[in-house]
């Protein structure tokens, strides 16, 4: 379950479905991925589908994981005890 968001843009997207400043072509897929994170009870739940490309992050995002929205955009988050924190749709590359 998503407990917190890292930014207001991601929270608004999830709560209202409005794109805000996100590119329109990622909105539908990002919402679907956010729902997957919300439904996950274990980090391993996010390994399926393989297109999520779930992986741990390093450097300044140590402790976070991410799943792919597309080739450019990711959803980054902390996952502890079946809950997601600091969820953020981002282009960190």
Tell me the role of every PLM-derived stretch.
Residues 41-65:
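A short, surface-exposed loop/turn module that caps and links secondary-structure elements
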Residues 1, 9, 18, 42, ...:
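Glycine-rich, flexible loop/turn motifs
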């Amino acid at each position: 379950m998503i407990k917190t968001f890292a930014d207001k843009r991601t929270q608004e997207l999830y709560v209202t479905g409005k794109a805000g400043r996100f590119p329109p072509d990622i909105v539908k897929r990002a919402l679907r991925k956010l729902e997957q994170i919300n439904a996950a009870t274990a980090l391993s739940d996010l390994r399926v589908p393989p297109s999520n490309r779930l992986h741990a992050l390093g450097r300044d995002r140590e402790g976070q994981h991410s799943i792919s929205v597309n080739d450019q955009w990711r959803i980054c988050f902390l996952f502890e005890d079946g809950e997601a924190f600091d969820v953020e749709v981002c282009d960190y590359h």
